[in-house]
């Protein structure tokens, strides 16, 4: 597999992570280096591990995974996106802070949801009979870098537009989930 192909696949896979990071950056204030590291590291790690998992399992579970992967991604993104929209409409409370998408189960759910497509890429790489290690490394690094860039851009948008960006970010997550669902059901 040549470098241009690997880079193209990496950028394409990182687009969902970038969009989610954009939404996360809009709701975290202030964004610290710790936030950037946590989300960038975890999104990159999951994006790198999923193709390896897909490659290792090969064709063994492809039919089972492909039957449900889009539902899993849709459910996770719709849940997190819906929660973001809900929190944006709640009354302002000085003691209440928005949930931090770079912590706990929210971060894990987002990491899984944005990297499920990378699992399918790993299955494809296995069918080509090539090594997965270089593509997985590049996929993870590109996802990590674009996640950090998305968070920083999201912060700028959040500072300028406030709750409107939080609502839009939540809706974007729901729409990404819907897009994944439609691509695997109606548009197949």
Swiss-Prot record:
Membrane spanning residue stretches: 3-23, 39-59, 65-85, 104-124, 125-145, 167-187
Highest taxon above the source species: Bacteria
Annotated keywords: Cell inner membrane, Cell membrane, Ion transport, Manganese, Membrane, Transmembrane, Transmembrane helix, Transport
Keyword Ion transport: yes
PANTHER family noted in UniProt: MANGANESE EFFLUX PUMP MNTP-RELATED
Topology in the lipid bilayer: Multi-pass membrane protein
InterPro entries: Mntp/YtaF, Put_MntP
Name assigned to this protein: Putative manganese efflux pump MntP
Function noted in UniProt: Probably functions as a manganese efflux pump.
Pfam name, any one: Mntp
Organism of provenance: Citrifermentans bemidjiense (strain ATCC BAA-1014 / DSM 16622 / JCM 12645 / Bem)
Family note: Belongs to the MntP (TC 9.B.29) family.
Gene Ontology molecular-function annotations: manganese ion transmembrane transporter activity
Localisation per UniProt entry: Cell inner membrane
GO CC, alphabetical: plasma membrane
Keyword Iron appears in the UniProt entry: no
């Amino acid at each position: 597999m040549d470098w241009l192909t690997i880079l193209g696949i990496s950028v394409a896979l990182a687009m969902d992570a970038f969009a989610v990071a954009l939404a996360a950056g809009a709701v975290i204030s202030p964004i610290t280096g710790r936030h950037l590291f946590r989300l960038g590291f975890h999104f990159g790690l999951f994006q790198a591990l999923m193709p390896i998992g897909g490659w290792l399992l090969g064709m063994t579970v492809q039919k089972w995974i492909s039957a449900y992967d889009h539902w899993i991604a849709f459910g996770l993104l719709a849940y997190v996106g819906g929660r973001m929209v809900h929190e944006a409409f709640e009354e302002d409370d000085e003691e209440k802070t928005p949930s931090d998408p770079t912590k706990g189960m929210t971060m894990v759910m987002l990491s899984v949801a944005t990297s499920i497509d990378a699992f399918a890429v790993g299955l494809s790489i296995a069918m080509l009979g090539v090594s997965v290690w270089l593509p997985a490394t590049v996929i993870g690094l590109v996802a990590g870098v674009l996640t950090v860039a998305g968070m920083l851009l999201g912060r700028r948008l959040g500072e300028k537009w406030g709750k409107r960006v939080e609502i839009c970010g939540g809706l974007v997550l729901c729409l990404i989930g819907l897009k994944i669902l439609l691509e695997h059901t109606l548009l197949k």
